[in-house]
């Protein structure tokens, strides 16, 4: 009997590099936030929590691993 390849499962959450639609500021955010994530420059909402995966209201530039 062989062992399964994924003995330890990888998390489904990621960090995202997003760009604010209002001011163009680039910021790194978590994909599953517990609180509302706001832009550090203008204060616009970038990600809203939903109890799981957040609703991203900014442009996703890159998924970081």
Swiss-Prot record:
Species assigned in the record: Pyrococcus horikoshii (strain ATCC 700860 / DSM 12428 / JCM 9974 / NBRC 100139 / OT-3)
Domain of life, per lineage: Archaea
NCBIfam families with a match to the protein in the record: PRK00415.1 (NF001629)
Note on how the cofactor is bound: Binds 1 zinc ion per subunit.
Pfam family, one: Ribosomal_S27e
GO terms under cellular component: ribonucleoprotein complex; ribosome
Quaternary structure and partners: Part of the 30S ribosomal subunit.
SUPFAM superfamilies for this protein: Zn-binding ribosomal proteins (SSF57829)
One of the GO biological process terms: translation
Keyword hit for Ribonucleoprotein: yes
Listed HAMAP family: Ribosomal_eS27
Record-listed Zn(2+) binding positions: 20, 23, 39, 42
Cofactor(s) named in the record: Zn(2+)
InterPro entries found in the cross-reference section: Ribosomal_eS27, Ribosomal_eS27_Zn-bd_dom_sf, Ribosomal_zn-bd
GO molecular function: structural constituent of ribosome; zinc ion binding
Keywords (A to Z) from UniProt: Metal-binding, Ribonucleoprotein, Ribosomal protein, Zinc, Zinc-finger
Name the record gives this protein: Small ribosomal subunit protein eS27
Zinc finger (C4-type) residue numbers: 20-42
Protein family: Belongs to the eukaryotic ribosomal protein eS27 family.
